[in-house]
Amino acid sequence: MKKFTNAEIAEIRANLNKGIVYCGIRSDGYGVGEISVSPTKEYIRWRHFGQSANKNTDGQLRWLLETIFKDCITVTPAEWSDYHIGYVPIDKQYKGIDYSTKHPNVCGL
């Protein structure tokens, strides 16, 4: 489990409030879950082995990252992928994500 600095928490929260979605990265390189902010910016929404929402505060974001996403080595900005039917890291460096046409969600391409 990664411990996040105050500066990292502030940066992630600022990006979330700008509309950037994050996903967790496990040690095997797989992207998991998603973290975003509600349209009113009052809540941080998350999905990872369940889903819920927390108040949009630094303390609640830290709890979320270090408790719910504790199996992740980091979190990174993500984008929706129709190909994967889910959020995947924008940075394609993570080896655990299959970008090939053999992915099970690719039909008839």
Show the residue positions of the predicted features:
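Residue-level detector of alpha-helical secondary structure
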Residues: I9, R13, N17, R62-F69
